[in-house]
Amino acid sequence: MIGLLLLFKRDMILGFHRTAKIFIIIVILGLFNFLYYLYFLHISLSKSNVAFWDIIGKTFTGVPFELVEQQTIEFPFGWIIFQLSGAILVNTFIKEDLFAHSAFIRVRTKSIFKLWVSKLLFCCTAILIFYILILSLTCFVWKLSGGTVNNLTDYGESILRYSSFQFSYSQIIVYSILLNIAGTFLFTFIFALLSLIFKTIYSFIVCICILFLSIFSDNPMLLGNAFMLIRHPMFGLSPVVSITMTLIIVPFLCIILLIVGGIYLSKYDLISNTEIE
């Protein structure tokens, strides 16, 4: 455990140093996505108060499948960016560090699996920091903008107009945020595993294709559907049960990906057959 903590500390220092520029870029993109809606709402709804959900809802809710069927879809660029934010942030860091420094660190730790786990722990930490920073800054600017309200507005209800269930205002915000964070975790783990086996660009394309297909199909096998609040329930009649099951299944899938990656690295000759992208 001490060895894992030391590796995690190393990855936190090295990882944030290597990914700082990309982190700043995706934070700016995320903020622009939300603050654009804040500006738009204050301009178009000048006589109405704006709720926090009004700002994040368009991005975090996903796309109603009814709009896809009607071919009146507004492509969810923001949702895709947030789902892929972990993969964008990590980029080639995991693969390059494993392949460039594996021989030295493997000898010291006597476990390539711990090195792999520490990399994924760094990913999870970076994702949480990203979401906390984005949401905190958005909330701060929202409060400063004035005309705020802490309940579901007419505009907020219009975002959920295709849903057949009713949540409280706080449930809507919490569930939508949790689902998006869970989706970012899962797609980052998928990307990290694939990038060990294939070129980074191919791994990224696979993740994009899964999300893209999820937008245009409500097939539950397409993982992106599970991370759109508007597409629930998927696994049961109750949306709360459905979301809870999703939040349970995601850690389970992440653990499977972690184990598969560890097995692959253990069997792969990291010293003699490496290729840094």
Show where each model-derived region lies:
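Transmembrane helix boundary and interhelical loop/hinge segments in multi-pass membrane proteins
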Residues: V90-V107
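Membrane-interface helix-boundary motifs at transmembrane edges
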Residues: G15-F16, F191-I201, S266-I271
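Transmembrane alpha-helices and adjacent helix-loop boundaries
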Residues: E96-H101, I127-Y131, I201
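Junction motif at the cytosolic side of a transmembrane helix
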Residues: L253-E277
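Central hydrophobic cores of alpha-helical transmembrane segments
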Residues: I25-L29, K199-I215, E275-E277
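Secretory targeting signals
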Residues: F32-F93, V117-L196, H232-P251
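Interfacial "coupling" helices/loops that link adjacent transmembrane helices in transporter permeases
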Residues: S102-K119
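Aromatic- and glycine-rich beta-strand/loop motifs that create alpha-glucan
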Residues: M1-V27
